[in-house]
């Protein structure tokens, strides 16, 4: 497995900066979020990558706000050890003392088919990447989140995981994806109740124009996904700004207006 840090550039102390961590940061929504956070002043943006060695270079040219910096770390959601290893490296090599925002964004949607013929190994892969990885990420980052003034733990969800409105999408051949996203919703809501100091919630980013979004559009017979990455990022950032423990934490919200997405 590639090392989580090939070289150690000088990174300013995190003590007076806003520190963000985003998984699945090499493309799509993850890259869009990294780009938006990096444009903010006095920020440290940590990009979690499935393969740091081959993917980190593509982020080097992203523009930066005043006194802001980027750190790329190895954070493969298919790995059970990467989250803890990445946090150790962030503390030891980069002097990270807190995390203000952690976004579990990395996901997989593949091996389409109904529950009646779904091989268990396909479900296990989806559960690891879409659900277990979010839990491992929280467990690894919890102490650094607790050191922040107003920490947020955000999981990118999917409305197809709904139970109450399953009838509207029951024929979609996305059993693996939907079930694993449902598990992630439970985990984040559980984290909300167990940690009174933390704002933890799930956000539906919309049907975005990413590689995964394009696949879903084809499955549903649509020409393309309706929501641009820029629109989704802007909405998520707006929801982050207004989020608090009493009104946001523990909920599954829509990126555009913060309304509830059915469980």
Curated annotation (Swiss-Prot):
Q: Which of UniProt's keywords are assigned here?
A: NADP, Oxidoreductase, Virulence
Key word Magnesium present: no
Induction info reads: The genes forming the sterigmatocystin biosynthesis cluster are co-regulated and induced on oatmeal porridge or the fungal isolates were grown either on oatmeal porridge or in YEC medium (0.2% yeast extract, 5.0% corn steep liquor). Expression is positively regulated by the cluster-specific transcription factor aflR that binds the palindromic sequence 5'-TCG(N5)CGA-3'found in the promoter.
Q: Which GO terms describe its molecular function?
A: norsolorinic acid ketoreductase activity; oxidoreductase activity
- What positions does the entry give for NADP(+) binding? 29, 76, 105, 177, 181, 208, 210
Q: Which GO terms describe its cellular component?
A: cytoplasm
The annotated active site, in chain numbering, is 177, 181
Among InterPro entries, the record links this protein to:
Fungal_SecMetab_SDRs (IPR051468), NAD(P)-bd_dom_sf (IPR036291), SDR_fam (IPR002347)
Family as reported in the entry's similarity comment: Belongs to the short-chain dehydrogenases/reductases (SDR) family.
Per its record, how is this protein called by name? Norsolorinic acid ketoreductase stcE
């Amino acid at each position: 497995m590639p090392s989580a840090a090939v070289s150690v550039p000088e990174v300013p102390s995190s003590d007076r900066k806003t520190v963000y961590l985003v998984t699945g940061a090499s493309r799509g929504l993850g890259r869009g979020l990294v780009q938006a956070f990096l444009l903010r002043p006095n920020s440290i943006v940590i990009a979690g990558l499935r393969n740091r060695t081959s993917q980190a270079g593509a982020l080097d040219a992203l523009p930066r706000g005043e006194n802001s910096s980027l750190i790329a770390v190895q954070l493969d959601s298919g790995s059970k050890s990467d989250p803890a290893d990445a946090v150790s490296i962030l503390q030891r090599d980069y002097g990270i003392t807190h995390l203000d925002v952690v976004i579990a964004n990395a996901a997989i949607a593949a091996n389409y088919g109904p529950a009646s013929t779904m091989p268990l190994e396909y479900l296990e892969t989806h559960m690891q990447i879409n659900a277990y990885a979010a839990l491992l990420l929280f467990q690894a980052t919890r102490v650094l989140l607790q050191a922040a003034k107003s920490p947020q733990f955000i999981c990118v969800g999917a409305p197809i995981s709904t139970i109450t409105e399953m009838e509207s999408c029951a024929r979609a051949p996305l059993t693996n994806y939907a079930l694993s996203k449902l598990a992630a919703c439970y985990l984040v809501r559980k984290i909300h109740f167990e940690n009174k100091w933390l704002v933890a919630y799930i956000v539906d980013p919309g049907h975005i124009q990413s590689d995964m979004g394009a696949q879903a559009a084809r499955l549903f017979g649509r020409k393309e996904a309706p929501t641009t990455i820029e629109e989704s990022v802007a909405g998520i950032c707006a929801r982050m700004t207004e989020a608090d423990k009493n009104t946001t934490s523990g909920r599954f919200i829509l990126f555009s207006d913060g309304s509830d997405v059915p469980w």
